[in-house]
Amino acid sequence: MDQPSVAIVTPIFNRIGNLDRFLAAIKSIDYQNYRVVIVDDGSTDGSSEYLRANHPDVVLLRGNGQLWWTGSTNLGIQWALENRFDYVLTYNDDQVCSPDLLLELTGHAKKYPDAVLSPLIYYMYEPKRILSGGIRLDANTGETSGVGNEKTDVVVPSPYEVDGVPGYAMLIPVAVLRNAGPFDNARFPQIYMELEFCLRARRHGFRCLIVPTTSVWNDREDKIDDPVRSANPIRRFKWYVSSPKSHLHFGQNMRLAHLLYHQVHGRLHLLPALRFVLRYLCKTLALSLMSKRYARRLKKRLGFNLDRWA
């Protein structure tokens, strides 16, 4: 039986150390009709030169350094559409996959031609702990939650529907791209682009499914060292108010809340964004108070100045 063609689109930027590992996993999959499309958005570590010398079989596209994840992925999608591929698989360079990834995803895509699909995503450092099993969202508040996140090796026998699938390994039929369009680079250049895309695809009559019978393992850092989840409120407060990544998340979350209200109710309204800003300010105030109390307790207990401690 003929296999449908799949373009595996991977954006990269200055992570030359990931290339051999991720390409070795891709090249070991039990599938023949695919091409790897790597979009290098201005790397300065020799990634493009390394790929040309060591992996000449991949399609290498170059960005201008301003594309981020979304623009880079859209460039790869454009190449796939121009070359008449049946599916696009968005795929990150910091992960590996099971050999049956494309067989499972394309097999279920034939059963569910109206769906965008994703495998279960696990942590690479803890291979049975789920990083993402799909996305649920509250259309009134814009808040999102994970399905099965942080659980251990939850096995579901058949695909299940979610509000959005993660962009780590998202199989998109070209019919979805032609009807709903590519990712929104203008409003979501780096985060939440997959959720916005899934919402738009659902408005055009498509579904989002998780295929739990195949897996990807992502190299995301251990959350023990994550300042967002640190037991030290001083560290969390400093990250929350000063980190550029926190500011990016704040802006994108506010846009997402605004967008969700518009998509659900058919009109624009400032209430969701204002509600999100209020929650942000309350959380910042709470972390500030927690930090001060935490510092006073430690200072009293340990007997030294903690003003500069974090």
Please give the residue ranges for each predicted region.
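Conserved donor NDP-sugar-binding/catalytic core segment of glycosyltransferases
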Residues: 96-138
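A recurrent flexible, glycine/aromatic-enriched loop bordering the glycosyltransferase active site
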Residues: 152-172, 240-243
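A short, conserved alpha-helix in the catalytic core of glycosyltransferases
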Residues: 164, 169-172, 176-181, 187-214
